[in-house]
Amino acid sequence: MTTKRKVEVFSAGCPSCQTAIELVNRLACGSCEVSILDMNDINVAKRARDLGVRSVPAVAINGQLASCCSGSGIEEQALRWPRQA
């Protein structure tokens, strides 16, 4: 049995966020459970802060801020994760 990966995309609804959402959805594998989280929700903003999100868009995988989000913008190569069926 394959363990699901919890992928969270923190978004403010901006064009860059929409591009990031499309990228994550395109790269997501069959074992990925993708959630789009609205930073306008105070609980989402608190979760983002707890994870160390400093700007949006940002992606967390299994509760860890993805390395693709530590610079300026999301980089596809850094976001790639090993695909599992």
Curated annotation (Swiss-Prot):
Pfam families, alphabetized: Thioredoxin_3 (PF13192)
InterPro entries (alphabetical): Thioredoxin-like_fold, Thioredoxin-like_sf
UniProt xrefs under Gene3D superfamilies: Glutaredoxin
Domain of life: Bacteria
This protein's UniProt keywords: Plasmid
Record protein name field: Uncharacterized 9.0 kDa protein in mobE 3'region
Organism: Acidithiobacillus ferrooxidans (Thiobacillus ferrooxidans)
Organism lineage string: Bacteria, Pseudomonadati, Pseudomonadota, Acidithiobacillia, Acidithiobacillales
